[in-house]
Amino acid sequence: MPDFFPFPLLIGVVMLAILLAILWRRKRSPSHLFCFSVFWAYLLLVLRETLFPIPFLGGMDGMRTMQQATFVLSHVNFLPFKYFAFHNKYVVFREIALNILLTLPLGFGVSFIARLKSRGFLWLAFAAGLVIEIAQLVISLGIGGVYRTVDITDVILNAAGVLLGYGLFRIFARLYLAVTRRFGIEQHGLLACVHDVVSNAGSWRSAS
């Protein structure tokens, strides 16, 4: 079965170049551009792991037939942790770990790109996995077959990953400030960018 894989990496690199040019014109610092590039690379990796490759099932002609759409929808799982009962402990642990690790960098790193209040992280945690699962469902409907399992469990675990990443960021922020103040480390370049982000972390929380 051939795979429908429209050069997502190339498209992502082109989009990154355009966004960096826009940010540069808006006088963003080189450190911010670096953080943005790393975060963008992470997002491309997430897309690669969750959506690609897309199997090509004889023509991408919309929602296909009603029978195929019904078949796809019948394989959507809305019962949390339903399939865990059918696997051994190793498989269950692996699935939990991978789903959490997938979005953990999102919860940790998004603060270097945008300023979110604590409430915003709750919305981000919910949206992260939901967007991925909806995209998988739409693609499955479009190709007329189940190519990825759409499961509410993944949404829950992805949300947990975002919140865990945010918690680790909060810990990192406090440790970073404590260490730099204790040893009088000067903040220049990338360190200055990091210091600015972690210094403002407390104000985002209090404003929530």
Feature locations, PLM:
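Individual transmembrane alpha-helices with interfacial aromatic-anchor signatures
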Residues: 149-160
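Bulky hydrophobic segments
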Residues: 1-147, 163-208
